[in-house]
Each structure stands twice: as C-alpha cells, then as structure tokens.
C-alpha cells in the first residue's frame, strides 16, 4: 500500500458515532507507529481533509471532504436518485432501508431511512463501512463483480463479527453462485446478532453491479411472508432505479427477478 493510500485510509475510521479521533486512539486502531501516523495526519490536515479540535487536539473531518462530497453529488447525482426508492420502501414496510456503494474494503452507505417506530430497531451508522463477506449488501455486490476483485477480497483474512459470520472463502463462493442465480442476497445474524438483512444489486450502463439496496431488520420480525415482501420491494425498486440510471440488468438476473415477482 502506498503512502498516500495509507494516509487516506485513516479517513475510514470516522463515523457518526466516532466523529473525533485522537492520535493515541488512531495508533490503537491502526497499529501504525506514532511518527508515521503523525506525518499522515499532518498531511491530511494541511490538505483540509482533517482539522483539529483546538481544545482536545483530536482530529475530525475537514472542509475538503464536504467540498468533494458536494462535487461528487453535483456531477454524479446518484444519492438524489436512490433517495426516492429508499424512502418508498422504508415507508411501505416500516423498516430500515439503505443504499450503498462499494469501496476498497466494503460497502459505504450513501443514504438510509428507518421507516418504522418499533421499540426494537436496528442501530445503523451511515458512516460505517459494511464488510463484503458479512453483509447482504456486500455479498450482493460481490456476486456481480469481476472475479479478480472478488478473489482479492476473499484472499484476505476475513473477520468474524458473530458466530454466524462466514469466513471460509469456498463457502462464500458457493453462496455467491446462489445469489447470482436468484438475484438477491440474504444474511442471518452474520454481521450483528439478532439482525438479518436482504439486498439486491443495481447495475450500471455496462451491466456491472455499481451498488446495492438493502433492508436490515431484527430477526424477530422476519417471517416467510414478510421475507418475500422485502425481496419483491427491493427487486421492483432496483428495476426502476436501473432504468433511471440508464443501467443494464443482466439477462439472467432480469429473468430471475421477473420469476420472483410472478410468484
């Protein structure tokens, strides 16, 4: 990994639940020596990607991040496009729905809405990177990504988050084949205990998966009927979203989705 990559990777540690991080915490989280870490943080600060709380000296995201996020949305307005579909599903089924795009090490949520008022809810941090191997979003994306990318992800040491997290590359590859055949991914407590999720990919102009739509829900509220409802809601939304984005749904996926909607 290049010096620039190592420095930029530090930005991934920030989240809504972790808006500020001090030098010592960075060292604990990254295992990078303090000297190198300080140089990386100084470079990011000088470039505007980070700023320091003058009282605590902890680092937080800087104005350059906001500017680039605005440029991205103005030039590639995918957030505005997916927002309609996420809101629609969330309002219909009264559960947490989110859209995510792939990054190097996982899926990054770009928009989420919890349409329910249940006492038991899924705690979701939009700034958190969702691991490819442990989430329905990640698996739905991997199933329709190129073999080289998938190979790199599965060749790494796969972290176990719960007793149900899949960490065997062969088993995951087999699951990806199943996902390719049906067009959606389902996970049961593989990333967080008592939480299940369903996800479908959405596709770009070349028929490649460029992101996912997903529903996360406490497993106590999942039954066969509602499971089917979630899948049909996601398939319908992704089909329309692909149309809006000018995307091409692969023929086998379109057939699988059409069959599912007929049931």
Predicted regions: what they are:
Residues 81-89, 154-199, 244:
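Short, basic/aromatic recognition patches
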Residues 202-205:
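Sensor-regulatory modules in signal-transduction proteins
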Residues 56-156:
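Amphipathic alpha-helical effector-binding/dimerization core
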């Amino acid at each position: 990994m290049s010096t620039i990559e190592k420095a930029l990777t530090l930005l991934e540690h920030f989240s809504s639940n972790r808006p500020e991080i001090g030098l010592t915490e960075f060292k604990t989280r990254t295992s990078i020596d303090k000297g190198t870490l300080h140089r990386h943080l100084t470079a990011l600060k000088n470039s505007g990607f980070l700023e320091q709380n003058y009282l605590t000296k902890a680092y937080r995201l800087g104005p350059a991040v906001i500017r680039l996020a605005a440029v991205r949305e103005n030039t590639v307005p995918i957030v505005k496009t997916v927002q309609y579909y996420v809101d629609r599903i969330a309002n219909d089924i009264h559960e947490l729905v989110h859209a995510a795009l792939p990054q190097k090490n996982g899926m990054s949520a770009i928009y989420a809405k919890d349409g329910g008022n249940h006492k038991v809810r899924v705690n979701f941090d939009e700034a958190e990177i969702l691991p490819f191997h442990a989430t329905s979003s990640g698996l739905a994306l991997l199933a329709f990504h190129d073999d080289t990318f998938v190979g790199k992800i599965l060749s790494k040491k796969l972290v176990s988050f719960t007793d149900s997290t899949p960490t065997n590359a062969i088993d995951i590859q087999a699951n990806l084949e199943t996902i390719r055949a049906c067009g959606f991914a389902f996970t049961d407590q593989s990333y967080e205990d008592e939480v299940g999720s369903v996800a479908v990919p959405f596709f770009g102009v070349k028929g490649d998966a460029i992101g996912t739509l997903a529903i996360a829900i406490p497993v106590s509220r999942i039954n066969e009927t509602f499971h089917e409802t979630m899948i049909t809601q996601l398939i319908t939304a992704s089909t329309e979203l692909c149309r809006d984005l000018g995307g091409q749904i692969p023929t086998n996926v379109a057939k699988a989705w059409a069959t599912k909607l007929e049931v």
